[in-house]
Amino acid sequence: MKNLHSLFLASAFLAGFCGSSLAGEREGVVVSIKPLHSIVSAVMQGVGKPKLIVQGAGSEHVYSLKPSDAEAIEHAKVIFWAGPSMETFLDKPIDTLGEGAKVVALGDAKGLTKLKFREGGPFEAHDHGHGGSHEEEHDAHGSGDHDHAAEVAEEGHEHHHHGEYDLHFWLDPQNGKILAADIAKTLGESDPEHAAQYEKNAKAYGEKLDALTREVAAELKPVKDKPFIVFHDAYQYFENRFGMKAAGSITVSPEKAPGAARIQQIHDKIKSLGATCVFSEPQFEPKLVKTVVDGTKARTGVLDPLGAELKDGPDLYPQLIRNLANSLKDCLSK
């Protein structure tokens, strides 16, 4: 009897495997990076859990796809990522392994506040690999009031004007709210049975992010006008939302070490502006930051745009935003 039961379970497993993989059926949700995975997780609560590609302290700038990642992409029904200019390591795998899945570049979500890359002076020139013109002109230095941000609401996910826009859009919690609604819509179309649950979750998460936005704005108000330097220019969405003032970045690409002239330029900028803090990131060696602040009165801190040390899941994203605020306030208020 026991052997018969084991045989039945084995047969059922094989039948399920053949019915999905061999028949080409897709199931499950895959997300590229931790902040976006957190928002998707919140929308999917009570229904399922998405698969995360870049885990732990990994960075989308230098990540190499693992066999388990490739397998997840191959069988995914829905794939969420920021877009081809952010997670370049996913370009080819999505085109090949992801063929047949619904692939959603969240950088194209309707209604997002989108900001152009900052260039010139303390902000090093960017390489617009996927460049393309846009119908509207936007403020390239959107680190002030929200009115300076570009509200782009084009045609959903069909267009890919990533080259001129900064894709760290999730660092504005109000963008996070828009993403949650967009994700709920996408999941509801792929899984109509749970569409109402996705919508309910997204609404609740949006309300949570509204409260978080108010909380962070109040916390940062005393240090809004204090200049600081960041490791790479990833934070202008956060700055724009909360009226912060980055004076420059050490490098535009974390995987590309700046030259001696660039380091000297930032060093001089710190001295001339009296920049209070220079921030590193946990994904990369802090040696450059130490070199830049040497001989100045600037302190050092850590800003994490990905939630490297946070536990994956729906709570990661709000905690990431809160941690950015805490790190800025702690360093700038000393």
Swiss-Prot record:
Residue ranges of the TM segments: none
Signal peptide: 1-23
Main location: periplasm
CDD domains: ZnuA (cd01019)
Residues bound to Zn(2+): 60-61, 168, 232
Keyword field: Disulfide bond, Ion transport, Metal-binding, Periplasm, Signal, Transport, Virulence, Zinc, Zinc transport
Disulfide-bond pairs as recorded: 277-331
GO biological process terms, semicolon-separated: zinc ion transport
Highest taxon listed in the record's lineage: Bacteria
Compartments in which it is found: Periplasm
Described function: Part of the ATP-binding cassette (ABC) transport system ZnuABC involved in zinc import. Binds zinc with high affinity and specificity and delivers it to the membrane permease for translocation into the cytoplasm. Required for survival and normal growth under low Zn (2+) concentrations. Also required for virulence and intracellular growth in host cells.
Name by which UniProt lists this protein: High-affinity zinc uptake system protein ZnuA
Species for this entry: Brucella suis biovar 1 (strain 1330)
Gene from which this protein is expressed: znuA
